[in-house]
Amino acid sequence: MNILIALIPALGWGIFSLIAGKIKNSHPANELMGLGTGALIIGIITAIIHPASSNITIFSLSLISGMFCALGQSGQFISMRNIGISKTMPLSTGFQLIGNTLIGAIIFGEWTSSSQYLIGTLALILIIVGVSLTAISKDKSAKLKMRDIILLLFTSIGYWIYSSFPKAITANAQTLFLPQMIGIFIGSIIFLLVSRQTKVLKEKATWLNIFSGFSYGIAAFSYIFSAQLNGVITAFIYSQLCVIISTLGGIFFIGENKTKSELIATFVGLILIIIGAAIQ
């Protein structure tokens, strides 16, 4: 049952990027605002069905972690439009894996034996090699630029904080979830204000992206449970199987072009990701 719960975030986080990518005339500001709104709605519904008590400290910290999540998501949406879903997601996954694995192993002490370090390191190597293979491109115009890498690396800090937060405090999932979704919504508003794109609130694409927010919100709720049941490292690695859904979806559903050799590299990379997640 714990593993099934760990796989729900992979499904939700894999699908939401495809929903956003399929909406016409959609831009990062539309996508982030729509996601924030949809996630907030899921948070409110969850709070009504499963009300949970909290205190000002836990509520405030949860809200801040949600705002950091919005930072991470803004980088993903911008990169998706610049270099495509099938390149963004593997690279983003790699950065997140490195950060969250180090946080889980060093700060939370989830690796306590030499065998755990050995197996965990092997799993991490397989997954990083896998995501690197999925990002291979022979088209010079489509190759990653340093600015794309720096953007994703910087914004991934938001994901590191958000992903590790459920393990940092003692509270149940229901207590954490609503304030985190409020934080994502507030973070989305801040993004619009800072980038001076408040006009997107009137655009159809923003409201259609609420459906991607529904998918994201369900995944986020499941992730909180998974992190508490399975530990940060295991929960995160399983959740990042979303890269399989988003990468293949970007190619076959969105229609992002890849040559035969690039497809082979992508499939090999995805297999390595699955193996790495399975042995973790």
Curated annotation (Swiss-Prot):
GO cellular component: plasma membrane
InterPro entries given in the database record: Sugar_transport
Top-rank taxon, per record: Bacteria
Compartmental location: Cell membrane
Annotated organism of origin: Lactobacillus helveticus (Lactobacillus suntoryeus)
Name of protein: Putative sugar uptake protein
Entry GO MF terms: carbohydrate transmembrane transporter activity
NCBIfam families: RhaT
